[in-house]
């Protein structure tokens, strides 16, 4: 079927009489699902989802595509409340501006991109033109796994620190502007969770108004995370996002690299914000501009590469769900052309931000204070313990466990609510119950049930545990539902820096 078309009526039209007798009823329910979810209330939509899940369990046998109900992706959203734009709040905007200043020198031109330009110039010369861009990108993708230059360039990007000179380098006419996305969580401070909670009423950096803004994690800020929801939020949202992308790229024609099935088919949900770049194996579209119709050229003024046709340069945007570094083959290099920036700022509590700046884990407990810049928290307070220091306090005697954990909290000043990371040794193979050691676990150190769950969660291969303050704690959440209940609130903010003058056409 054509890109964007409802697949179920198209599939129903292909059935033979015998197939229609076996499957027509199921297909009819799926066809109806698309209409029903737009008019029914939340309870009925949930029942529709459960019905589709039961159908998926019959269609996909156990273990064929993973755990049941593999093959089913359903998304929904509903809100009766109105949210104000957080950037209209002076203090929050100031926090975002502070963060932008901190991460600015960390958003630099990638050395992998430099290598791509170097290999292009070696083949086509300065100012040269390649009539077959796909062939060039595939030649890069077919480099051997042990390519020393590629490994060195990737290592330099990972190990590099802030570099204003590389931050000032152009990325090319086809590329995005420098960008960074940040997940920011507002915190209401000045309350105490309970009488036994030893946190101070005003945490460091509370500033005026009794509020903090915590940097939870970084992502990209080119619009990909917003594109993730364009099908849910509708046409006007999609058009506004497309206008914003074209304005930021500084070019009227921006094509979307739509990799609808790479890694998983959920990639397709973000496709469709911009006209697609036609790629081999992708669904056809009347709006697509084939890669084969474009030329790849070198701009000697900026030492960058760009795509163009007879009308002039075109921009590229990759808005997919799958991270750029996980794409394979020629696609990784094509996406690099659209987004040549390394974004490895350590100012967040995400696993990669913490581990990147951390020395070898110690054999003794270590406390790291909160890092604040005015009201902006870029690193939560944390404690690292050898795993035995914590695991040894936990057993099935809940009373004894509570006493020992309370003593640990009092000695180290640990709040009642924390997130726990476990660090397994380099030779560990077992995933145990966690499957992914990078995912933190919320723990209430006052709760026997929470401590018992923590005891069962810790991998036997874990060598160290990190306890990171839960900021906000449950009583510090800044969100409020339409009914007045407190709830978690997190903003995704996209930071973009204006393109270098040499990148504008």
What is the role of each PLM region?
Residues 273-278, 284-505:
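Long C-terminal appendages of very large multidomain proteins
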């Amino acid at each position: 079927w054509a890109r964007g078309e409802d697949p179920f009526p198209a599939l129903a039209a292909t059935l033979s009489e015998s197939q229609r007798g076996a499957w027509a009823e199921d297909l009819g329910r799926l066809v109806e699902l698309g209409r029903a979810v737009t008019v029914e209330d939340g309870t009925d939509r949930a029942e529709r989802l459960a019905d589709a899940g039961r159908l998926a369990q019959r269609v996909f046998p156990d273990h064929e595509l993973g755990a049941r109900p593999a093959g089913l992706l359903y998304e929904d959203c509903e809100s009766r409340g109105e949210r104000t734009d957080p950037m209209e709040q002076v203090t929050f905007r100031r926090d975002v501006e502070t963060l932008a200043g901190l991460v600015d020198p960390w958003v630099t031109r990638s050395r992998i991109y430099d290598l791509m330009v170097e290999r292009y110039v070696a083949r086509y010369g300065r100012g040269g033109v390649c009539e077959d861009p796909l062939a060039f990108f595939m030649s890069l993708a077919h480099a051997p796994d042990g390519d020393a230059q590629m490994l060195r360039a990737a290592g330099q990007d990972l190990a590099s620190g802030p570099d204003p000179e590389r931050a000032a380098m152009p990325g090319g006419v086809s590329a995005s502007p420098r960008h960074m996305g940040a997940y920011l969580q507002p915190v209401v401070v000045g309350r105490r969770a309970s009488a036994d909670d030893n946190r101070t009423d005003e945490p460091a950096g509370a500033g005026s108004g009794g509020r903090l803004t915590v940097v939870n994690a970084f992502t990209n800020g080119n619009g990909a995370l917003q594109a993730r929801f364009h099908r849910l939020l509708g046409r006007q949202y999609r058009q506004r996002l497309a206008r914003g992308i074209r304005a930021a790229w500084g070019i009227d024609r921006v094509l979307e690299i739509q990799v609808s099935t790479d890694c998983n088919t959920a990639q397709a949900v973000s496709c469709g914000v911009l006209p697609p770049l036609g790629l081999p194996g992708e669904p056809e579209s009347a709006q697509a501009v084939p890669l084969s119709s474009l030329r790849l050229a070198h701009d000697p003024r900026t030492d960058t590469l760009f795509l163009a046709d007879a009308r002039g340069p075109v921009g590229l945007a990759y808005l997919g769900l799958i991270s750029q570094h996980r794409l394979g083959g020629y696609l990784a290099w094509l996406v690099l052309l659209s987004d040549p920036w390394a974004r490895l700022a350590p100012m967040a509590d995400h696993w990669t931000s913490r581990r990147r700046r951390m020395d070898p884990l110690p054999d003794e407990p270590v406390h790291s204070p909160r890092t604040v810049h005015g009201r902006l928290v870029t690193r939560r307070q944390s404690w690292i313990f050898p795993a035995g220091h914590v695991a040894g306090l936990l057993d099935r005697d809940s009373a004894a466990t509570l006493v020992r954990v309370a003593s640990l909290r009092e000695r180290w000043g640990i709040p009642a609510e924390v997130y726990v990371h476990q660090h397994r040794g380099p030779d560990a193979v077992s995933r145990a119950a966690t499957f992914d050691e990078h995912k933190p676990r919320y723990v209430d150190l006052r709760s026997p049930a929470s401590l018992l769950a923590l005891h069962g969660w810790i991998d036997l291969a874990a060598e160290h545990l990190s306890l990171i303050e839960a900021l906000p704690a449950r009583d510090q959440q800044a969100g409020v539902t339409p009914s007045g209940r407190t709830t978690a609130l997190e903003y995704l903010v996209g930071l973009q820096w204006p393109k270098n003058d040499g990148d504008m056409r």
